[in-house]
Amino acid sequence: MIIMKAIVLENTCKAEDLKVSEIDMPQVKDDWVLVKIIGFGINRSEVILRDYKADEPYINLPVVPGIECVGEIVDESNTDFSKGDMIVALMGGMGRSFDGSYAEYALLPEKNVFKIPDVAFNHLTMEEIIAVPETYFTAYGSISTLNLTKKDTLLVRGATSATGLTAMQLASAIGCKIIATSRSEDRFEKLKRYGADECIVDDGDLSSQVLSNKILELIGPKTLLDSLSLLEENGICCVTGVLGGIEYMDGFDPIKHLYNKYMTSFFSNFPTQEIIDEIFSFLVKNDIKPAIGKVYSSLEDIPKAHKLMESNNAQGKIIFRLI
């Protein structure tokens, strides 16, 4: 049996409790592919899993965390992939129901593995490609769900997050007006570099300071009612994140709070090859470079990456490039 390095989560724990272990490399099976991990991004859902979700019954402990990766097929099994194919993989139970990307190798279901189009390698570095899968799929899906056009005014709540910066890049390419929020004026310059036309300090209560017809709510239930109060008539609010740390909301009255307004959400659990191709094509066509906050190169640094995510100071995607 071949041994590999991985982070194995056995129960809820602190970031510093995550340690590199040596475990057996997974054995290939029908409809799954063995992938050599080139790199992966760190996601807030992985921090939440480690912090308090690991004890939920749908989590198959012990598990290797990690909901996304970029890698190379080393054993294609009976699938349509070929050895050597460069792929992205994301979601579908990755890092929860089955072992994910915090490892040197991962055995992944064919349905959640997608070829990276050749055009991507002509436009993006490997680090930039690693920053794409989950964050750009989420941002692209959210922008599409909002039916964003160049005539719209988009308010991005939680704009300094990786998804917020990404969404602004995509929205800027579409040509709409972008209003971005941050807890500090120190981040306004960066927000403007990523497409913001106007920046607002957000203390959780914007009190109708600004009205918009489209809102991307990344903070979640903590500010959702306030965001709905900022929507123009027939406006749309898409709830995609829970940066505020609160997952559920009390006091919501749909008749009152959604009067002549619309609320929707985007859930990134159902990627397809078609959408992955669309995302990379959009990036190339509009000369968009992913926003990277920090690059690590060793699994030993996973605790540092989780702490950086918890600090909300990354200001871009936290990624690992292992090879």
Predicted features and spans:
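C-terminal hydrophobic helical "lid"/dimerization subdomain
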Residues: I2, T272-I323
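Glycine-rich beta-strand-centered segment in the early N-terminal region that forms part
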Residues: D24-G41, K53-M94, G100
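Short, well-ordered loop/turn sites that connect or cap secondary structure elements
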Residues: D80-S82, L148, L231
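Short glycine-centered segments of the SAM/dcSAM-binding site in methyltransferase folds
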Residues: M86, T153, G235-I236
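NAD(P)H dinucleotide-binding glycine-rich loop of Rossmann-like/cofactor-binding domains
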Residues: L90-G158
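Mid-domain Rossmann-like dinucleotide-binding core that forms the NAD(H)/NADP(H) cofactor-binding site
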Residues: I130-G204
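A short acidic, Gly/Pro-enriched loop at the edge of an enzyme's catalytic core
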Residues: S207-I215
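Glycine-rich phosphate-binding loop and adjacent beta-alpha segment
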Residues: K222-I288, L322-I323
